[in-house]
Amino acid sequence: MASSASDGTHERSAFRLSPPVLSGAMGPFMHTGLYVAQSWRDYLGQQPDKLPIARPTIALAAQAFRDEIVLLGLKARRPVSNHRVFERISQEVAAGLEFYGNRRWLEKPSGFFAQPPPLTEVAVRKVKDRRRSFYRIFFDSGFTPHPGEPGSQRWLSYTANNREYALLLRHPEPRPWLVCVHGTEMGRAPLDLAVFRAWKLHDELGLNIVMPVLPMHGPRGQGLPKGAVFPGEDVLDDVHGTAQAVWDIRRLLSWIRSQEEESLIGLNGLSLGGYIASLVASLEEGLACAILGVPVADLIELLGRHCGLRHKDPRRHTVKMAEPIGRMISPLSLTPLVPMPGRFIYAGIADRLVHPREQVTRLWEHWGKPEIVWYPGGHTGFFQSRPVRRFVQAALEQSGLLDAPRTQRDRSA
């Protein structure tokens, strides 16, 4: 978090209140041990109506440990700033509460998300890989925060966000479309193509695939001030990042519809992307499905959980104060518009990043308890999970995005 209500420049202190090196290195081991101990207590005392709990095993502990390593890396990119910086953050959060409260957006969050204009001008460039070809598409985002919104000038100074980028795998004939929304620290072509198994979705299942890059990720993360990340401790940056991500994807949907008016469109999001996809699915009508993988339900609450601040740390007050803003940009405050048969969620029972009960279960309940798969793994374990792969394909079939088995596999032209 990095600006006062007056929107000063991004200012960071060299002093970090990070844990000592030794305790930081031992953290994943200690946290995994605590997780295993708690898992045994939950497993032995679980009730039928509670969150599914698997018998603790070495494999499950390994998944939890891997998550703890990932979490350690994410925290290294997001060190907690000192009290002086948090004082400025508190001022901006207070200004945000007043700004959003005066417009009643804290009570009616749908008004916060502005309706973007249709997307008409898109640049398309063909890219040839070793064996395949695909497209990169570019367009001007056109997003700006609301006039007078706290943090807006700082956000607009992140000029790399002004242009949206996306990967496109497209068939020559009309086909259903799947918009795949990546997670934190992604937004790079090789990684996104692999994690989403995009070529299988395109070549074998016959889908057109679009993979937009979220704000402050990939090419949109160039030239940022040190410490500027999305999501991160800067609450108003998180608000603007969420709003722009939703805006950009809604514009992209308008372009897809202008290309193939009759084709079905679905959303497929991972982690942070599942959070963004759930918001889009609560604002945009006409979507065939929304598949939410290990989704975040309340971004500000999640960041507060992982901030590492002690209970009596005065900076905790800022985190607590920001909770109404977190609820404003949460899908838990909106009504999903995707039909019930098109809602799907999958999550890991050993997830150490996105807490299954605090995040996923609440979103699942809010969405009317749609089809859900709990795989025995951590946050990153979905990639190796066969139940998840089968679930995603079944979701696409149930939503009508997949037709009869294809006799000819089209490759992008």
UniProtKB/Swiss-Prot annotation:
Has strong T-cell and IFN-gamma inducing capacity in human tuberculin skin test positive patients, indicating this might be a good vaccine candidate. One of its GO terms (cellular component) is plasma membrane. Disulfide bonds: none annotated. It comes from the Bacteria. SUPFAM superfamilies: alpha/beta-Hydrolases. Induction: A member of the dormancy regulon. Induced in response to reduced oxygen tension (hypoxia), low levels of nitric oxide (NO) and carbon monoxide (CO). It is hoped that this regulon will give insight into the latent, or dormant phase of infection. This is Uncharacterized protein Rv2627c. The lineage of its organism: Bacteria, Bacillati, Actinomycetota, Actinomycetes, Mycobacteriales.
